[in-house]
Swiss-Prot record:
GO molecular-function term, one example from the UniProt record: mismatched DNA binding
UniProt family annotation: Belongs to the DNA mismatch repair MutS family.
Role noted for this protein: This protein is involved in the repair of mismatches in DNA. It is possible that it carries out the mismatch recognition step. This protein has a weak ATPase activity.
Superkingdom classification of source: Bacteria
Pfam families linked to this entry: MutS_I, MutS_II, MutS_III, MutS_IV, MutS_V
Protein name in the entry: DNA mismatch repair protein MutS
Length: 891
């Protein structure tokens, strides 16, 4: 039986609760209330873990596993980490998707003794539960990516699911309805760190798919956690509204998604939730659909290894602020599908591209701004420092300077869309003055250190600090007095956290201490330490004054933070303006630096790219002083499919990716790596590129390929762009050719969308003769005897050779192996030529051979019965493939 399934009696019996020490009983009580967490239990200067938690954590953290006494003769496993290094160790636990409960001491040992005597146990309780989706510490989360906590609600007997997301670090929250078939695609876009799901979905296909595809934590909750009445009340209470319509027009499942996420935040943050705006209602169709495999294959925000280097994001990201980097990440994850909105962004990019002089100055100024979104969150959650307030102050100051730069350069002659961006930059004089007058420039990170409030801000602060300074001067006077009395010129008065103030002399001067007022405290190798009643009284007065100052500073700081929070709406608008400026100046910068051009958009099936380049490959070649070979792509209603053949290593895969990436970059509002680009808006991009066995899922290369292809054919629309590379290569040649042929026909006749289809099956090129919207293209090469030169140019025509032996030779295979392979290849070619001519001639002369619509249906009563039980809208691609195998047996 797992801990989570135990009742209180079983739990206490397991750990011998009745004979445990009071401290261990306290630990067990708190642990039982947080069975799904690793419990970090504060013990003095350490956070300690016990029993199973200790064994698990010691392995993850790489720290020693020890023991803390015995319970019924059984040793208690224990490990611990210093309190000041907590964030370092939390990072490792969160990376492994664990949930961690922080249990703090709520009183000092002295306070406990006053309350309950010498044997009193310090009061402790969980002050916060940290999960992958609820962290806000800068060291634990990416500065340039959102950190989403997501609640997924899938109503029974409905085809639409609801998703609510919150990024606690920036206090952003939104809700979206998605078709049930698009759930995984939407989760791929969001890249959530933690997903809340009903326990009823624990063994469902969706839960299984999330665990396999995404590196995130799934937190299961009982079904009642998502109950409509409960969730509606939570929303009304949280936002202090009387009617749910105050949120907007939302469905019941959206209410459940929002309410459940607010409840989870309340449970983990212990009521210390930042101010969250009313959730923004997002239209699913506003964004391009890009499924998980396509995002991975195109390496949009990470490379194939999950790292930033070599990704499109890494190539395009020359932003100078962290919030600008996050906005660019959002843009690339969520390309737009609305022409008006795309053109709005392009117009902003074009303005800055036409005014590069001001772009340089803006980018320099933006470097002086801070991530005020996350500063504001820390302030609202009572986890801030004076430096957060100073960051807001400096940002307000810089924003005003940037606004002045526009006024100085353009006066009133600014386009309205630029005016809208810079309007919030005017600043807030009241807020700026408040922080400027109150917070010291050298404010420490820790409020308990004192010295955060300027002396002149409050008369009592000045008075107490004068007292403290006078006491410190008095200490200096005492030092001089004691030197004269003892005639020890090297005598010092020092301070540490254990002894407080003490008189410090060298051992050789001990015989000069004759007056009994000098009370011995400590002897070390290099010093002997004393105190006096006079010094002790002075220290007590100093400590009391410092305590009063820190207490008053905390009160004043809390009041200042409250006033800052009152300005949170404006500060969030300011943060959005600054991040937008950063991104669009970044677009202008890369357009100028890398010779990008403004794309044009239409509502038809145009796809006219002239001299297009792959941005990532081009950037890599640039470092080696090599040039990228550009290529055109001209898809249209009349020529929707390009069938691309050519040798290995010629650049087919790069060409496929490049056109998909150009589309994505264009639809985020950026200029693109091409001489010109005219694109009919793409609603979905799908790619099937690369092949590898998925051993974890128990899938062969071919099965993985067929599942992806099946999903693409099921989800694409006429406005989609499909990129397919080597479909059918994971099986026998004739099976592969047949599948590839049939897929091409389906795309041409049924989907009628734009498609780039690369293949080594040269037999497919004959399809041009009877698929009017298909055209053959190949990669140009130059042959010189036995050698070939890859020119990387896409040209009209078809290739009948793959030049695989040439690539094998380049890879270093022995010459004897290459020569033998050439002999075998020649024999195979002689055998197959006559067969291929016969088959393909028959295919071109008799279309019905590959046109299943004209064939008579199979008469099979069992098959008919099976078909009647199927709801095509409710089966997954994997289930569809399994049915195909089943039907084949029936036939």
């Amino acid at each position: 039986m797992t801990l989570c399934n135990m009742n209180l009696h079983e739990f206490r019996q397991k750990y011998n609760y009745n004979v445990a020490t009071k401290m261990m009983q306290q630990y067990l009580d708190i642990k039982f209330a947080h069975l799904d967490c690793l419990l970090l239990f504060r013990m003095g200067d350490f956070y300690e873990l016990f029993y199973e938690d200790a064994i698990l954590a010691s392995n993850i953290l790489g720290i020693a596993l020890t023991k803390r006494g015995k319970n019924c003769e059984e040793e208690i496993p224990m490990c611990g980490v210093p309190y000041h290094a907590l964030e370092h160790y939390l990072t490792k636990l969160i990376e492994e998707n664990y949930k961690v409960a922080i249990c703090d001491q709520l009183e000092t040992p002295e306070e406990a003794k006053k309350r309950d005597g010498y044997k009193a146990v310090v009061t402790r309780d969980v002050t916060r539960i940290i999960t992958p989706g609820t962290i806000i510490e800068e060291n634990l989360i990416s500065v340039t990516e959102p950190n989403y906590l997501t609640s997924l609600v899938i109503p029974k007997n409905k085809k639409t699911a609801s998703i609510c997301c919150v990024d606690l670090s920036t206090s952003k929250i939104f809700v979206i309805n998605v078709p049930e078939t698009e759930i995984l695609n939407e989760l791929a876009r969001l890249k959530s760190r933690e997903i809340l799901l009903s326990e009823n979905l624990k063994s469902s296909n969706i839960s299984d798919s999330i665990l396999k595809q995404f590196n995130c934590r799934i937190t299961y909750q009982v079904d009642s956690f998502f109950a409509i009445n409960k969730c509606e009340k939570i929303i009304l209470d949280f936002y202090k509204i009387r009617d749910i319509k105050g949120i907007g027009e939302i469905s019941n499942s959206q209410i459940c998604a929002i309410g459940s996420i607010l409840e989870y935040l309340s449970l983990t943050q212990k009521q210390n939730i930042p101010h969250l705006p009313i959730p923004k209602i997002i239209n699913f169709h506003n964004y391009m659909t890009i499924d998980f495999s396509t995002r991975r294959n195109l390496e949009i925000v990470t490379n194939l290894q999950g790292n930033l280097y070599g990704s499109v994001l890494n190539t395009l990201n020359h932003t100078v602020t962290t919030q600008g980097g996050r906005l660019l990440y959002h843009f690339l994850s969520s390309p737009l599908t609305n022409i008006a909105k795309i053109n709005h962004r392009l117009n902003i990019t074009e303005f800055f591209y036409s005014n590069l002089g001001i772009v340089t100055r803006i980018r320099e100024l933006l470097k002086n701004t801070s991530d005020i979104e996350r500063c504001l969150t820390r302030i609202t959650m009572n986890r801030s420092s004076g430096r957060d307030l100073l960051s807001i102050k400096y940002t307000l100051e810089t924003a005003k300077t940037i606004k002045g730069l526009f006024s100085e350069s353009y006066g009133l002659n600014l386009p309205h869309f630029i005016e809208k961006i810079i309007k919030p930059l005017s600043g807030d004089a009241e807020l700026y003055n408040l922080i400027h007058m109150s917070i010291r420039e050298d404010a420490p990170n820790n409020l308990n250190d004192g010295g955060i409030i300027k002396y002149e801000f409050h008369p009592k602060i000045a008075q107490l600090n004068d007292l403290i300074n006078n006491k410190k001067l008095h200490v200096e006077k005492l030092k001089d007095q004691y030197r004269k009395e003892t005639r020890i010129e090297s005598l010092k008065i020092s301070h540490n956290n254990v002894l407080g103030f003490f008189i410090d002399i060298t051992p050789k001067n001990v015989n000069k201490i004759l007056d009994p007022k000098f009370i011995h405290r400590q002897t070390t190798i290099n010093s002997v330490r004393y105190t006096t009643y006079e010094l002790q009284n002075l220290e007590n007065e100093l400590v009391n004054a410092q305590t009063l100052v820190i207490r008053l500073e905390k009160e004043l700081y809390t009041d200042i933070c409250r006033k800052v929070i009152e300005k949170s709406s404006y500060l969030k608008i300011l943060a959005n303006s600054l991040s937008g400026l950063d991104v669009f100046c970044n677009f202008a910068y890369i357009a100028d630096e890398y010779d990008y051009t403004k794309p044009e958009f239409t509502n038809d099936l145009s796809f006219d790219i002239v001299k297009g380049r792959h941005p990532v490959v081009e950037a890599a070649l640039r470092k080696t002083s090599k040039s990228f070979v550009y290529n055109d792509c001209h898809l249209s209603e009349a020529e929707r499919i390009w069938l691309i053949t050519g040798p290995n290593m010629a650049g087919k895969s790069t060409y496929l990716r490049q056109n998909a990436i150009i589309t994505i970059i264009a639809q985020i509002g950026s200029f693109v790596p091409a001489k010109s680009a005219k694109i009919g808006v793409v609603d979905k991009i799908f790619s099937r590129i690369g092949a590898a066995d998925d051993l974890i899922k128990g899938q062969s290369t071919f099965m993985a390929e067929m599942l992806e292809t099946s999903a693409i054919l099921a989800q694409s629309t006429k406005n989609s762009l499909i990129i397919l590379d080597e479909v059918g290569r994971g099986t026998s040649t004739y099976d592969g050719v047949s599948i590839a042929w049939s897929v091409l026909e389906y795309i041409h006749d049924k989907l009628q969308c734009r498609c780039l289809f690369a293949t080594h099956y040269h037999e497919l090129t004959v399809m041009k003769n009877f698929l009017p919207a298909l055209q053959n293209y190949t990669i140009a090469i130059e042959e010189s005897g036995k050698d070939i030169l890859f020119l990387h140019n896409i040209i009209l025509g078809a290739s009948n050779k793959s030049y695989g032996l040439h690539v094998a030779a380049l890879a270093g295979l022995p010459t004897s192996v290459i020569n033998r392979a050439a002999q075998i290849l020649l024999k195979f070619e002689k055998i197959s030529i006559s067969k291929e001519k016969n088959i393909l001639s028959n295919a071109s002369n008799n279309l019905s051979l590959f046109n299943f619509e004209h064939e008579k249906p199979i008469s099979n009563s069992k098959l008919d019965e099976e078909f009647k039980t199927i709801d095509p809208d409710k089966i997954s691609p994997k289930e569809a493939l399994e049915l195909i195998y089943k039907f084949k047996k029936l036939v």
